[in-house]
Swiss-Prot record:
Entry protein name: Cytochrome b
Keywords in alphabetical order: Electron transport, Heme, Iron, Membrane, Metal-binding, Mitochondrion, Mitochondrion inner membrane, Respiratory chain, Transmembrane, Transmembrane helix, Transport, Ubiquinone
PANTHER family named among the record's database cross-references: CYTOCHROME B
InterPro entries xrefs: Cyt_b/b6_C, Cyt_b/b6_C_sf, Cyt_b/b6_N, Cytb/b6-like_sf, Cytochrome_b, Cytochrome_b_C_euk/bac, Cytochrome_b_N_euk/bac, Di-haem_cyt_TM
Note: Heme 1 (or BL or b562) is low-potential and absorbs at about 562 nm, and heme 2 (or BH or b566) is high-potential and absorbs at about 566 nm.
A GO cellular component annotation in the UniProt record: respiratory chain complex III
Keyword Iron: yes
Stored SUPFAM superfamilies: a domain/subunit of cytochrome bc1 complex (Ubiquinol-cytochrome c reductase) (SSF81648), Transmembrane di-heme cytochromes (SSF81342)
Residues involved in a ubiquinone binding: 201
Annotated localization: Mitochondrion inner membrane
Topology term for the membrane: Multi-pass membrane protein
Cofactor note: Binds 2 heme b groups non-covalently.
Length: 379
């Protein structure tokens, strides 16, 4: 009799995706982040569900309801901090996952890469709306500043902003709709993840060498299931250390002050994972220009498959490209630091230089270096 996992319509899908899936034998720990992102999404949906049971999306009671969760609900403080810091872990895994894709040339799987970029945008939108929900000072002013950016769109800008706000300022209507969107988007993300995996399994995984690995495949289970469990345990360990020892390390103290439209915080800044984009936004002294640069900083990921001029797929055997890649990483860390600094000398000029370098490396230097490497190898 054939095994049920190979015949049952539902089990068959699971079997082909997680058990009998042929996987390259040499994929490194950098390939763990896909499963870790799945784990992060699961943690966020579960903790978010329990938070939603006690949260009220009304301007009068939102802040109090979060306080109530932390003080009165059984382990409410734990659920809330796992959710808040889980978002940080989510973005750490996201950035490492994208970085892996760039380094090893995984972006040559067009559909998988493009769905991944859509996922990145949707996760960023979800995180932004989630940050507004506690209705602290930084929630309110962050929502005001970021939604206001849409007013830079010519002709329809102001109408669009007021339509999103549901009034003439960020108020009850805004909070209610942000809660609704924040609740629904993770399920849309889950659907997109399935599409992402569907396209990935059409081609199979890439591997560190960037070479075709059809001649050397091993079953996903037990080899990579065990490897993924190790990654999951380490992720949970780091998350719980963060949650139990310094839950507010990555947060902003201003968000412990209830939202007050009459008093602006001295430094309005988003959560750490948006700081690089925020720095690029601020480095251009024009509203529309800044917004375009902000969107371009993520959309530029779409250009990687088009600008891949090297004869090799992976950067594993391309030392010059490796150097430029790590300079790009350092540049992004610099932008993240600048995004959290006040708008004054010398931070303004550092931010502008880092922003220029970011776009220059991706659009000019990396393709040029690829061509030089081709020449050096007489290809």
């Amino acid at each position: 009799m054939t095994n049920i996992r190979k015949t049952h319509p539902l089990m068959k899908i699971v079997n082909h995706s997680f058990i009998d899936l042929p996987t390259p034998s040499n994929i490194s720990t950098w390939w763990n982040f896909g499963s870790l992102l799945g784990l992060c999404l699961t943690i966020q949906i579960l903790t978010g569900l329990f938070l939603a049971m006690h949260y009220t999306s009304d301007t009068m009671t939102a802040f109090s309801s979060v306080t109530h969760i932390c003080r009165d609900v059984n382990f409410g403080w734990l659920i809330r901090y796992i959710h808040a810091n889980g978002a940080s872990m989510f973005f750490i895994c996201l950035f490492l996952h994208v970085g892996r894709g760039l380094y090893y040339g995984s972006y040559t799987y067009f559909e998988t890469w493009n769905v991944g970029i859509i996922l990145l945008f949707v996760v960023m939108a979800t995180a932004f709306m989630g940050y507004v929900l506690p209705w602290g000072q930084m929630s309110f002013w962050g929502a005001t500043v970021i939604t206001n950016l849409l007013s830079a769109i010519p002709y329809i800008g102001n109408t669009l902003v007021e339509w999103i706000w549901g009034g003439f300022s960020v108020d009850k209507a805004t909070l209610t709709r942000f809660f609704a969107f924040h609740f629904i988007l993770p399920f849309i993300i889950t659907a997109l993840v399935m599409v992402h995996l569907l396209f990935l399994h059409e081609t199979g995984s890439n591997n560190p060498s960037g070479l075709i690995s059809d001649s050397d495949k091993i079953p996903f289970h037990p080899y990579y299931t065990i490897k993924d469990i190790l990654g999951a345990l380490l992720l949970i360990l780091i998350l719980m250390i963060l949650v139990l020892f310094s839950p507010d390390l990555l947060g902003d103290p201003d968000n412990y002050t209830p939202a007050n439209p009459l008093s602006t915080p001295p430094h309005i800044k988003p959560e750490w994972y948006f700081l690089f984009a925020y720095a690029i936004l601020r480095s251009i002294p024009n509203k529309l220009g800044g917004v375009l640069a902000l969107v371009s900083s993520i959309l530029i990921l779409l250009t990687f498959p088009l600008l891949h001029l090297s004869k090799q797929r992976s950067m594993m055997f391309r030392p010059l490209s490796q150097l430029m890649f790590w300079i790009l990483v350092a540049d992004l860390l610099t932008l993240t630091w600048i995004g959290g600094q006040p708008v004054e000398y010398p931070f303004i000029i550092i931010g502008q230089l880092a922003s220029i370098l970011y776009f220059t490396i991706i659009l000019l230097i990396l393709p040029a270096v690829s061509l030089i490497e081709n020449k050096l190898l007489k290809w």
